[in-house]
Amino acid sequence: MTESAKPRLLLVARTRYELPLSPSLARKFSALGERFDVRVLATSADGGPHDDGTFRLVGRLPLLDGPLFYVLLPFRVRRLAREHRAAAIVTQSPYEAVSVLLARTGARVIVELHGDWRTATRLYGSPLRRAIAPLADAVGAIGVRRADAVRTISPYTSGLVRAIGVEPAAEFPAFMDFELFGARPPVPLPAAPAALFVGVLELYKNVDGLAKAWRLAAPQLPGVELRIVGRGSRRDVVEELVRDLPAQTTWTERLTQAEVAQALDEASCLVLPSRSEGFGRVLVEAFLRGRPAVAMGVGGISDIVEDGSNGLLVASDDELAAALVRLLTDRELAERLAAGARQAAERWLATPAGYAERMAAVVAP
């Protein structure tokens, strides 16, 4: 298909991109480029503005990043939509959708729902953001209801939009590149039991709950280690846990994907204590390495983890501690759940071309 014949698509998100793109993102946008004439309006990872002809990345100012982004977004969208002559605009949250609707471009507006928009103000950011939660809830609902189409990523997120009277146009996960995790067969569980957490150290990931659970579980698991990988605003919680349990807790701020795959091979299970998840990519990564999950049964986690089949689901921090003790002291249980985890991973795998094809079906009027 020639460039002139491709549908003109504008993607809008507050996502922070770095140029050049990582190999994984490059594959995703290359596949989208086969189907669409794509432009992206997002934010810059390094804080400065960039425009390479496909990605227009706006700069960021400390403390004012969020407010400025949304205040200026309708004007930026209107300008870029006109330049690009966009036939459709896809947003990665209902909040961006409202800004796009205010721009009144005439293009179709499609919302991608990656999670519960109501948690954005309650579990991310400052007390001020939590204070405006009721207003933000209402604004997000307007974005979902007024959009021309809504694409969800899981049964959980589909349920969220149906609860406010909207039927999703499609349900499929965002493209996730699992090549490094599925490239080789899983290895047996390690002889020395260990648990692994991989994620940002933020409120919605319930890092505080993880620390509480490990303090309860560790005395019952002599010689067993919790390995934490991540960085974020709750780092002080992890630092204190490492000080309190230095022989049973390690912390690494950042690993490459290949190193995360290796860390999973060296663990008996993944632990995911999140308070909210739209999907939970790290669960699929763990499953591909044949590692079961001990996780909170919230949001999209329950769409992936089947209690007693490929992991253990819990409802509280105390239950999380008990489940960790149970799995890390019962080799037979761990091996049975590990086998179930590897089988469960297959349903979540997709190629870049397959993802782009499904996006084309949603974008088509």
Positions of PLM-derived features:
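Aromatic "clamp/platform" in nucleotide-sugar-dependent glycosyltransferases that forms part
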Residues: 275
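Conserved donor-binding/catalytic core segment of Leloir-type glycosyltransferases
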Residues: 10, 151, 187-205, 211-215, ...
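Membrane-proximal helix-turn-helix segments that form the acceptor-binding/catalytic region
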Residues: 28-30, 75-79, 117, 130-150
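Nucleotide-activated donor-binding/catalytic signature segment of Leloir-type glycosyltransferases, i.e.
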Residues: 239-258
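Short hydrophobic beta-strand element within catalytic cores of glycosyltransferases
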Residues: 292-295
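A charged, aromatic-enriched C-terminal amphipathic alpha-helix characteristic of glycosyltransferases
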Residues: 335-363
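Carbohydrate-associated surface elements
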Residues: 156, 175
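Conserved acidic donor-binding segment of nucleotide-sugar-dependent glycosyltransferases
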Residues: 307-308, 312-318, 326-332
